Amino acid sequence: MSKKAVVLLSGGLDSATVLAIARHQGYDVYCLSLDYQQRHRAELQAADRVTKALGAVMHRTVKLDLSVFGGSALTDASIAVPEVPSEGIPVTYVPARNTIMLSLALAWAEVLEARDIFIGVNALDYSGYPDCRGEYVHAFQAMANLATKSAVEGRTIAIHAPLIDMTKADIVTQGTSLGVDYSLTVSCYQADDEGRACGVCDSCRLRRQGFVAAGLADPTRYAPTAGIR
């Protein structure tokens, strides 16, 4: 019997790498994306490209409009995306986003009878988001194994965060070795409709630094007006 895994896929660099890792580990991969009315909607088209390139069994996108709550520069157009690193948790944090996404992945995993969920959170080269830490992942896994029919009946769920302790350079190096085409991905928080990056947001900065540190060419497509810092 094949082993199934649900992979959370944003369409960015990290989640594409996680998809490649899951495939390399022999999983039949079912990708789940969330259309939460994010500012950088080009990442949803990127997710489609990545799933096709890396051979996912299925890709589903769930629509859940988090802009009705706002509270983040990624869901509220009145909040500007910062161009320089800030102190504390940045305004690009989307309240409870990873918890929502993992909950949806958990529901689908139960239906698929899959015991494994992959997420691309990273605790080193990240922006300070509280739901990108190892203790958060462990806590969600503990909750999942208390709250699901499958776990109660003996089919426990494992939450895999293979990038959690990796630098961005480590991530792009491993992904490249696994055949990830990063030109298909979109990381920018304010990418234009064609998926071209701004070059100045925190996500662009971390992505670019990763390729430089890894000694790899940066395949990111930048908008004509992009500022590279």
Curated annotation (Swiss-Prot):
Note describing how the cofactor binds: Binds 1 zinc ion per subunit.
GO MF, one example: ATP binding
Catalytic activity as recorded in UniProt: 7-carboxy-7-deazaguanine + NH4(+) + ATP = 7-cyano-7-deazaguanine + ADP + phosphate + H2O + H(+)
Cofactor(s) in the UniProt record: Zn(2+)
Disulfide bonds: none
Binding positions for ATP per the UniProt entry: L9, S10, G11, G12, L13, D14, S15, A16, T17, V18, L19
Record HAMAP family: QueC
Family named by the database record: Belongs to the QueC family.
Protein name: 7-cyano-7-deazaguanine synthase
The organism of origin for this protein: Methylobacillus flagellatus (strain ATCC 51484 / DSM 6875 / VKM B-1610 / KT)
